[in-house]
Every structure is written in structure tokens, then in C-alpha cells.
């Protein structure tokens, strides 16, 4: 299966957490900001990306590849000028408002006031 077909398959089979997050990010619903879902970037496919702000949002769950893979992936994405926010699916499902606040804060380059912070934030120095 080529990357384009694989990406289409991911869009059609999103996790519950990805679907919930997409409901809030799609169609400029977050403060007029444009996100894309299941977007190929180089050798990777990211869950959500805001190209203008160079921000990637990842939903991590049971199928998650692990910390070593994330470190390699995030290092490559960072080298391309992106910031990466990672949230556990459980947080997206149970603490949706806090997750959305953390994303909003990252879009506006502010620290979140929420007690929830992303599991990992990678910023380019």
C-alpha cells in the first residue's frame, strides 16, 4: 500500500480520541485556525498539523510505537521546524477542554493555564 492510500485508510479509521479531537480542530473551529489530519510529512504521517504555526498534535494510545520511535520521529519533525504536542488518548477523551486549551496556548505561544500539559513538547531553539 502506498503512502497516499495508507493515509486515506488512517483518515477512515481514526481512533475515538482522534475523532473527538478532529471534531474540535476541523473547519477552522479552533479560533479560525486551519488544521489538517493524517498528513504525510517526509517519511512520517502526523495526526494533525497546522502548517502556518508549524505545530503538530499527536494522539498517543495503545497502538503507540513507543518512546524511542517518538524521539527519532520528533527529532526529524523538529529539524523541519515543527513543534510537536503529544497527548494520551485517555486525556483527549476525558480531559478534552484541557487538551484544547494546551493546543490553543501553543498556537498563541503562551503557557497553558490548565493543569494538563502535553506529554511531550518539542520546540525549536
Segments predicted by a language model, with ranges:
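Charged, terminal alpha-helix-loop-beta segments
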Residues: 38
